[in-house]
Regions:
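Short S/T/G/P-rich N-terminal loop/turn motif that feeds into the first structured element of a domain
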Residues: 1-197
């Protein structure tokens, strides 16, 4: 029996744009620049609360090469020309699990937080799957930062926005996170999938 194939690692870039339609044209026109740096368009997302907050996920062949590209004047220039109006937040994700089953739900929740110990946190996280299902959340991606398994990023499909929001603010979740060794407050980002490649 062959071992399961590890999901592709991801480069996530989040920023605000002046005009989404104009930005998208410019983004897609620069595809050869990304491909030359081992990056492959995967998903474009728009913030649920602010649709001009855009998150781009690219499949990443090589984290070191991606980091060089992220720091390059060429990328800065391309972003400026595309109408990016905020400093980008850039993350390099070592993806541990990804559910790629087709799903028509379009809303996602990304949660990012620091953990004291990956293995202890993961064991606790796995034991609370039913709680997430009851809150209208389906596990989609489990990842940590390349080279640092203390910075965890999770993506969930949201089937019930009211339940998901209530759960994300609940004392129950806060308690479970503390027990699992989450260190500091989590960041929550609700978004819609605008385009898949």
């Amino acid at each position: 029996m062959t071992a399961p194939v590890k999901p592709a690692n991801l480069l996530l870039v989040t920023h605000k744009v002046a005009n989404y339609a104009k930005w998208l044209v410019a983004y897609e026109a620069n595809d050869s620049l990304r491909v030359a740096n081992g990056l492959h368009s995967y998903v474009i997302a728009r913030g649920l609360n602010d649709s001009n907050t855009v998150m781009v996920a690219n499949k990443m062949d090589d984290a070191a090469k991606a980091k060089e590209f992220a720091a390059s004047p060429a990328l800065k220039d391309a972003m400026q020309k595309a109408g990016v109006i905020s400093a980008p937040t850039i993350s390099y994700m070592d993806v541990q699990m990804q559910d790629t089953a087709t799903n028509t739900a379009n809303i996602r929740l990304m949660v990012t937080h620091k953990v004291k110990d990956w293995d202890a946190w993961k064991k606790s996280f796995d034991s609370h799957k039913q709680t997430r299902v009851d809150a209208g959340l389906t596990d989609r991606v489990i990842a940590y930062s390349v080279g640092d398994n203390h910075m965890v990023t999770l993506v969930f499909i949201v089937s019930d926005m009211k339940k998901a929001e209530a759960f994300s603010k609940s004392d129950d979740l806060k308690k479970k996170m503390e027990e699992a060794g989450v260190d500091g407050p989590p960041a929550f980002f609700y978004y819609t999938v605008a385009k898949k490649y």
